[in-house]
Amino acid sequence: IGYLKLLKKNGVKRVVLTSSMVALMGGKKTGTIIPEDWTDLNSKNISTYFKSKTLAERAAWDFINNQSGGQSLELVTINPGGVFGPPLGDNLSGASMSMMVKFLGGKIPMVPNASFPMVDVRDVAYLHVAALTKTKAANQRFIATEKIGRSFQSICQLLIDNGYKGPSTKVAPNFMLKFLSIFDR
């Protein structure tokens, strides 16, 4: 919030915040996700990562919605799914790239029986530019992902089909994932 205050004080008109799909979908079991959705922070199965992304974006919107004095700062949030594509450099530490590196290196012996919403990094970049330049984008949230997520198993199979040896297509039993989720609080 300190950055938003500083930007407003210095006359910046609009800020584009990269949030995440996890700020919209946590706690939702089925159905379509829309920009008005928010992760249910009271849901018992929400990870700390989901909570942190949701709280950060909510704080930004609270600041925007409670501004007083001077020109109002506009906010646009981009909520991407897993972001994949060519990296800018050698740093592969982002959440999506780290996961892919683990798949490629055979570090994940089993995959969850779940789907994963994905988006190309170049599409996310385009959305950021549009969010800054399009008048209608002011004070809106934009979901950046394909309509239907891909299963982790199909992602790994695609990697195998393209010559990678590390990925596993073995699906982890749901009970194992539920047990392991206890430690992600």
Give each language-model segment a name.
Residues 9, 43-76:
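Active-site Tyr-X1-5-Lys
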Residues 1-47, 68-69:
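Conserved Rossmann-fold NAD(P)-dependent oxidoreductase catalytic core, especially the SDR/UDP-sugar
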Residues 127-185:
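Mid/C-terminal beta-alpha module of Rossmann-like enzyme folds, strongest
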Residues 69-71, 85-98, 131-142:
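Glycine/proline-rich active-site loop of Rossmann-fold NAD(P)-dependent oxidoreductases
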Residues 19, 79-80, 84:
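Conserved SDR Rossmann-fold cofactor-binding beta-strand/turn motif
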Residues 40-45, 89-90, 97-119:
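A conserved pocket-lining segment of Rossmann-fold NAD(P)-dependent short-chain dehydrogenase/reductase
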Residues 51, 77, 112-125, 141, ...:
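Conserved loop-to-helix N-cap of the C-terminal "lid" that shapes the substrate pocket in Rossmann-like
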